[in-house]
Amino acid sequence: MSRRCELTAKGAQVGHKVSHSNIKTKRRFLPNLVNVTFLSDALGRPVRLRVSTNALKSVDHRGGLDGFLLKAKDAELSPKAVDIKRQIQKKKLTAELAALA
């Protein structure tokens, strides 16, 4: 399991730990990842993803998982998130066609 957010693609970064005497040693800055279960309104089922806390705020800001995924670029999303996005788009399209008929 990689240390990468499935929604924002945030991953580990490399930097320096600087001591009082200004000695620099390499270290890794890891993202704050949490396992979260989102409820998709379009799919009507829970979706489990490993996301950063920054992504949690973004999902909340955009009105839930469906709104976030529909506005997100496919390049930033994990393959699992892209698959969920496609399912949401299909459900929304069928719901719109059913409403027109």
Curated annotation (Swiss-Prot):
One of its GO terms (cellular component) is cytosolic large ribosomal subunit. It comes from the Bacteria. The keyword Ribosomal protein applies. One of its GO terms (biological process) is translation. Pfam families: Ribosomal_L28 (PF00830). Gene3D superfamilies: Ribosomal protein L28/L24. GO terms for molecular function: structural constituent of ribosome. InterPro entries: Ribosomal_bL28, Ribosomal_bL28/bL31-like_sf, Ribosomal_bL28_bact-type, Ribosomal_bL28_sf. HAMAP family: Ribosomal_bL28. Belongs to the bacterial ribosomal protein bL28 family. PANTHER family: 39S RIBOSOMAL PROTEIN L28, MITOCHONDRIAL, LARGE RIBOSOMAL SUBUNIT PROTEIN BL28M. This is Large ribosomal subunit protein bL28. It comes from Rhodopseudomonas palustris (strain BisB18).
